[in-house]
């Protein structure tokens, strides 16, 4: 989908589809699997549509959030995307993880297409683009380019060492050896 062209012009609309489907067991029908975000200058809105896995043949629309945003918030979001994708260079692609697809439309109605893995975030002015979007839109569950870290992973741990150990619990042993 990426057409190899950095964004140019004045950004007026963005559409970001984040899909969490990855290698592994089939999700439960009520598991949220896809989010679609649309931000538009013309409508001065941000719209987030959330889809569940359903029966696997077609995702089921679960929730839709539509918010009228201030002109400043819309400008901040679009300026961030203009800057990030004017100098865009593709990053590595992880084939067993989720993915994102982005379409940016400029004031001349030219469309620019980008894609990547749902774990590769971007930085803008030293801040995560995904985190900045979540903050401006006040949608903490927004995935964008990289889902927010789950706070539950840290629950009950007193040190960073305990969190690190969570990732090293699988040990392969030969039968009969301790």
Give the positions of each predicted feature:
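N-terminal glycine/threonine-rich, aromatic-flanked beta-hairpin/loop signature
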Residues: 43-54
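Short, well-ordered, aromatic-rich surface patches in folded extracellular/luminal domains
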Residues: 1-30, 34, 56-178
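Short, solvent-exposed coil/turn segments at beta-strand boundaries
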Residues: 38-45, 108
């Amino acid at each position: 989908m990426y057409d190899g062209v950095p964004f140019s012009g004045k950004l007026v609309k963005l559409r970001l589809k984040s899909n969490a489907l990855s290698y592994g067991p089939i999700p439960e029908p009520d598991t949220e699997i896809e989010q679609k975000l649309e931000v538009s200058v013309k409508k001065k809105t941000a719209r987030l549509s959330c889809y569940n896995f359903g029966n696997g043949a077609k995702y089921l629309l679960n929730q839709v959030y539509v918010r009228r945003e201030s002109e400043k918030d819309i400008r901040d979001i679009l300026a961030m995307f203009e800057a990030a994708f004017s100098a865009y260079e593709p990053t590595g692609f992880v084939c067993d993880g989720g993915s994102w697809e982005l379409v940016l439309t400029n004031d001349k109605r030219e469309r620019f297409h980008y894609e990547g893995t749902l774990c590769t975030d971007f930085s803008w002015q030293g801040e995560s683009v995904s985190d900045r979007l979540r903050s401006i839109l006040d949608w903490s569950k927004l995935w964008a380019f990289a889902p927010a870290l789950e706070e539950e992973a840290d629950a009950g741990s007193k040190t960073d060492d305990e969190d690190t150990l969570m990732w090293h619990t699988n040990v392969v042993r030969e039968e009969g050896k301790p």
